[in-house]
């Protein structure tokens, strides 16, 4: 089985349950159904994107995020919204490639990047619509920072944040050029497991607290709505 490019969300799903990852992202046997929370998050991201990119007025329900966006707009530099980035491994080195390149190894989409090449830095912002930052994971920021260093070779420092707009909380992380790919060493064991699963074509179920009520893979015996 050919290895497919992975993303932060895809690897997170594989870490939770390889079978769920396979059925949803590889076999695609489960139709994607947007929950109300997902719909809200997508609408919020879209509103923020067009406010930043085109100065389009925010819908009334998202007016509360304007102070955050205005502060970001005051930062000097070139802005990129919903920027798709990817990398490939060629000659044992990480290299830039097109997002849809068949040889892509890792993909990521950044909500907002502001580059200030004169100061060799970039600002990275990922908007979150959750109610709390209590379980925030900065791995996503580290992965996006690695992509930024490849796609913007003049950047030597990435200052990033998870911006929880509803909770009014910010989780910050800073990355430097010399340790730009450290995140892949941190994820090495999970990435080896992912490759082994593709090589063998075996994606085993991993029973967890989400199986009974929240998993969409109803053909799994651990699902609360299991059906053959």
Feature annotation, model-predicted:
Residues 1-228:
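RecB-family 4Fe-4S metal-dependent nuclease core
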């Amino acid at each position: 089985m050919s290895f497919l490019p992975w993303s932060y969300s895809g690897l997170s799903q594989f870490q939770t349950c390889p079978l769920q990852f396979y059925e949803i992202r590889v076999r695609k046997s489960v139709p994607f159904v947007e929950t109300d929370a997902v719909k809200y998050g997508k609408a919020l991201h879209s509103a923020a994107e067009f406010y930043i990119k085109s100065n389009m007025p925010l819908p009334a329900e998202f007016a509360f995020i304007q102070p955050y966006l205005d502060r970001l707009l005051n930062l000097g530099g070139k802005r990129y919204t919903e920027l798709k980035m990817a990398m490939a491994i060629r000659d044992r080195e990480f290299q830039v490639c097109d997002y849809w390149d068949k040889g892509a190894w890792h993909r990521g989409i950044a909500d907002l990047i502001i580059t200030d090449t004169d100061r060799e830095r970039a600002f990275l912002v990922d908007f979150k619509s959750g109610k709390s930052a209590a379980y925030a994971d900065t791995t996503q920021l580290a992965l996006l920072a690695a992509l930024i260093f490849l796609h913007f070779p003049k950047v030597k420092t990435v200052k990033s944040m998870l911006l929880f707009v509803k909770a009014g909380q910010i989780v910050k992380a800073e990355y430097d050029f010399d340790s730009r790919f450290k995140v892949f060493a941190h994820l090495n064991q999970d990435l080896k497991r992912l490759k082994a699963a593709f090589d063998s074509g075996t994606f085993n179920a991993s029973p967890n607290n989400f199986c009974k009520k929240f998993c969409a893979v109803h053909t799994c015996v651990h699902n609360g709505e299991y059906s053959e």
